[in-house]
């Protein structure tokens, strides 16, 4: 996960400062030297780091501990405020025209950044706001680019306008605008061609499209895995074509994350979205304050709540709660809970958003705590059951267990352990409900996840 190493190093810096009653200039300089190295190792631009350290030092030197905050907490606040300022302070959204007019968004970027997939995801995000979208396939060079956009558009329930690969991108863009106006679409998103590297032909094509149709927003998609190259690409696109915002993809991968901290400062353009995975819900609105909180290991509860609201069916959740109270939670409910957890990015993603958890546990610790392979085996066990067995776990006798184990590709001992754990959880749910009903304290129990 991005920023994992940076978060750990910053936490160590703050830990060393917590025992001091007053921050001397020497204390601050020593701490900021470590912060500087941590940021540089995270692939943050040198110029950006230099200015950042200067701003923090000016505020931190000689400050007394105020309002009950210890020095470590005070430095965290100063660093947090500067990180937020560095990434843009305020959240920037795509500016849309009134619904009676057509908003034209042009997507640009290099090949491999995830531009076409991101284009469809943005359409899906804006569709949820009640807009009628049209995607236009303007990439006539890359093999299967048009088909890829059509497949992704279908996933989001968004129409794709295509004229094949024999027409000029400019002509496709103009025809798409006519189609949008004629058929009542109020958002047109142009998926333009990517290149392996920036060249004059590519830039000229984008300029020609902007000259031919009234583009309202030009969004650049860059790959966070490329580090400082992503920052350089943003600066070059802005200078040559003019961009209004950036979408930073693959921030969930094994990347140092420095691009997220550098792009705004270097290009002057805001990050609108960050890609944290493959699903639509993994394209997250970029909130500078929440990202700063994640970097400092303080979690991101607001984003977690929003993910839950977007992915959890409220009616199903209420029905499941009632079944848990009556100890009627069955294997179908187990599958539903697994699906909801997956839609939220998995247990590791959820834990990383909880305050303190991501800071105290490295990625390897989370992996040992949450065995995704073990969860997959348990899900395979449930999927090997018949519908009646899932509804009524009491039906599962030894011969049925043999069949289930064979179907799931596990040994019968694992099936026995899982079913026993499941039954214990159901009993604990019932006991806990009774305790709470009598005014007792809630007890802890482990779900078979």
Where do the protein language model's features map onto the residues?
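Long amphipathic alpha-helical segments used for membrane anchoring, targeting, substrate engagement
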Residues: 3-20, 290-449
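Primarily NTPase-proximal linker/entry elements flanking Walker-type ATP/GTP-binding cores
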Residues: 6-138, 145-165, 173-192
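Residue-level signature of catalytic and energy-coupling elements of molecular machines
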Residues: 17, 43-45, 79, 110, ...
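Short, surface-exposed connector motifs at secondary-structure boundaries
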Residues: 129-134, 156-160, 188, 213-218, ...
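Short, glycine/polar-rich helix-capping loops at beta-to-alpha or helix-loop-helix junctions
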Residues: 143-149, 230-233
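Conserved phosphate-handling catalytic cores of large alpha/beta enzymes
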Residues: 173-176, 181, 185, 197, ...
């Amino acid at each position: 996960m991005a920023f994992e190493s940076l978060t750990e190093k910053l936490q160590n810096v703050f830990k060393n400062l917590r025992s001091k009653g007053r921050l001397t200039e020497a204390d601050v300089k020593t701490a900021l030297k470590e912060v500087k190295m941590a940021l540089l190792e995270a692939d943050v631009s040198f110029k950006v780091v230099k200015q950042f350290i200067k701003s923090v030092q000016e505020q931190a030197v000689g400050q007394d501990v105020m309002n009950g905050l210890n020095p470590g907490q005070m430095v965290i606040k100063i660093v947090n405020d500067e990180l937020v300022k560095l990434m843009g302070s305020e959240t920037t959204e795509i500016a849309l025209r009134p619904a009676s007019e057509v908003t034209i968004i042009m997507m640009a970027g290099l090949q491999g950044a995830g531009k076409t997939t991101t284009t469809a995801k943005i359409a899906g995000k804006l569709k949820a706001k009640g807009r009628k979208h049209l995607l236009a396939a303007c990439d006539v060079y890359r093999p299967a680019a048009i088909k890829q956009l059509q497949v992704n558009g279908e996933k989001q329930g968004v129409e794709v306008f295509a004229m094949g690969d024999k027409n000029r991108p400019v002509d496709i863009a103009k025809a798409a605008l006519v189609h949008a106006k004629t058929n009542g679409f109020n958002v047109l998103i142009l998926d333009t061609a990517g290149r392996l590297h920036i060249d004059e032909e590519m830039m000229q094509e984008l300029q020609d499209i902007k000259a031919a149709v009234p583009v309202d927003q030009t969004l650049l998609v860059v790959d966070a895995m490329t580090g400082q190259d992503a920052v350089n690409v943003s600066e070059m696109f802005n200078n040559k074509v003019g961009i209004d915002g950036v979408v930073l993809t693959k921030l969930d991968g094994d990347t140092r994350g420095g691009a997220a901290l550098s792009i705004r400062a270097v290009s002057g353009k805001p990050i609108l979205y960050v890609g944290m995975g493959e699903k639509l819900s993994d394209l997250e609105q970029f909130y500078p304050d929440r990202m700063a909180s994640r970097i400092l290991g303080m979690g991101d509860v607001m984003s977690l709540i929003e993910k839950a609201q977007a992915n959890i069916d409220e009616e199903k959740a209420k029905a499941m709660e009632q079944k848990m109270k009556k100890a009627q939670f069955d294997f179908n409910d187990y599958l539903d809970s697994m699906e909801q957890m997956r839609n939220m990015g998995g247990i590791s993603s959820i834990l990383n958003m909880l305050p303190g958890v991501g800071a105290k546990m490295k990625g390897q610790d989370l992996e040992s705590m949450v065995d995704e392979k073990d969860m997959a085996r348990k899900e395979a066990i449930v999927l090997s059951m018949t519908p009646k067995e899932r509804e009524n776990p009491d039906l599962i006798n030894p011969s049925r267990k043999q069949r289930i184990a064979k179907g799931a590709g596990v040994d019968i001992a694992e099936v026995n352990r899982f079913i026993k754990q499941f039954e214990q959880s159901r009993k604990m749910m019932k006991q806990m409900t009774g305790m709470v009903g009598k005014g007792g304290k809630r007890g802890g129990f482990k779900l078979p996840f």
